[in-house]
Amino acid sequence: MAFTPSSPPSPAADASQRPSRYPGEDTTPTSRREILGWYAYGIAAEVFAVCGVGSFLPLTLEQLARERGVLKSSHLPCVGPDAPTSSLANGTAPALLRRDGADNDQCVVGLLGLEINTASFAMYTFSLAVLVQALTLISFSALADYENNRKTLLLAFGFIGSATSMLFVFVAPPVFTFGAILVIIGVTCLGSSFVVLNSFLPVLVANDPSIQGASKEADEELHTLNENGQFEPRDSFSERNPEFESQYTPGIGLGSKPSTNATSPELQLSTRISSKGVGLGYCAAVLVQILSIGLLFALSKTSLPKVSGTLPLRFVLLLVGIWWFSFTMVTRRWLRNRPGPPLSTTTTGGHTNKWRVWLRLVGFAWKSLWKTVKIAVQLREVRVFLVAWFLLSDAIATVSGTAILFARTELKMSTTLVGCLSITATLSGMTGAFLWPVVSRRFKLKSSHTIMLCIALFEIIPLYGMLAYIPLFKKWGVIGLQQPWEIFPLAIVHGIVSGGLSSYCRSFFGLLIPPGSEAAFYALYAATDKGSSVIGPAIVGMLIDATGQVRSGFFFIAILIVLPIPLVWMVNAEKGRMEGVAMAERMAKGQESETGEPGEEAEGLLARGA
């Protein structure tokens, strides 16, 4: 894929450019247009993350399989004129607005010689998708740091991912397995593109004109951002916000020298741009979610749902794909290439062995991850917290997928209501990101205590769902997620808790990292996150197959959520900080012989997506 090179900088711009660190580096000052191009991709892809992966893709997969499935006991079709439930609505109720299949029988579909529940099919698909995504993230992380690969990979992932969403409009029930393949490709492209997108951030910040101006004033007061987004001197910022000293500084790899000024202008600007990008992405997701609900409601008034219950859902995914593609085009136009260092290729017979170099970089990425693992297991506090994070991130991913399918198959909620449920959780997540720092300051909670409080509130979700097994509540027909309205308060809890956990776990882990190894350890943090999310959905899928009910997954989820609490309580942050400093000193003594390795910068890329 070829891209038109950006226009050469003007002489005026040359005056403010920093020196190049390697041949071919683009040190053109970052423009507002380029920042908007960076924002544009977040606006593009976050819509697929929230509206696609978080809402309509699980429903579409389940409904596609259901329209090809049969009832386990009678082998009658789950959907259609021969289905046992078709007479309940005299053939007039669209499949979009109700759950098909008998209440006490499960709908199964044949796959690879096995009969699996249609809800399990969706869970297994996402479990496999996350596994492929994790392998891709680690393997491709090293490639994007070189030459024009950064922008090439970003656009490739964006265009391929948006195409998978748009192609769903052609996925009919007879080829429902093709939908699973599209989900795997789409989820992989989504996660990989966000990692590459975040790798642009340190480059944009380093070339920002205000950063260049601030860097010339050495030995002066620390600069901070004013309300107009420019830097101005400010005293004792670290005293106002000491936790910034432990935040991740982009671009630092394993064995690099730690930053002497963690509250530097670069970090402040990076935080500001990143936060705004996340906010714009979520706002775009909510907007498209509202548009999708309107589209679903309008299509429910037509004959399309009678043809296939998935047609309206597939039109929504078409809308999501078009949105992703359109804003990726904006990014293609406005975001500069910002090439990395050239690959040191060798030639054989006049041909450049670039593929051999790429394979070497892939191997280096895995080698770097393994090297970090060996260091991490020597740090007791890091080791314990990573186990806790492994369980916790798996629980978060499992609850999200299970809740959507539970609302659709157990509570018989319409797709429109499920969309409203997703909006509720998204808005609550945005609220939680701002709420938990206030709660933590108000009650003077340590980071570990805030995390444990979030986990305790998170446990409410599966425990409440299990109340329906109590005969008294089951007889009442309410309490224990037996009525659709009951899931909305839990969606608020889920959103608020998730917003707190994502930010506090990351910052708490930053306290334990050996100084100078931030990027490598956050790469391990990201790999732990993605790798763990394979297990939970697969186990819940097996429970659904065994029992025929999505509700049975609440037992596993309840155990999974509570397990990290004692582990987080066991982590001593101060001891972990001292262990990290001691490890950094030991690493520094043996680092000199390892400097200059070609992939030194590559370790940081995966971390930027954490």
Swiss-Prot record:
Basic and acidic residues bias spans: 232-243
Glycosylation sites: N90, N261
GO BP of this protein: amino acid transmembrane export from vacuole; autophagy
Stretches the record annotates as Disordered: 1-29, 229-265, 588-610
SUPFAM superfamilies, per the entry: MFS general substrate transporter
Keyword Glycoprotein assigned: yes
Acidic residues composition bias: residue spans: 594-603
Predominant location: membrane
Job description of the protein: Vacuolar effluxer which mediate the efflux of amino acids resulting from autophagic degradation. The release of autophagic amino acids allows the maintenance of protein synthesis and viability during nitrogen starvation.
Protein's name in the database: Autophagy-related protein 22-1
Organism from which the protein derives: Aspergillus terreus (strain NIH 2624 / FGSC A1156)
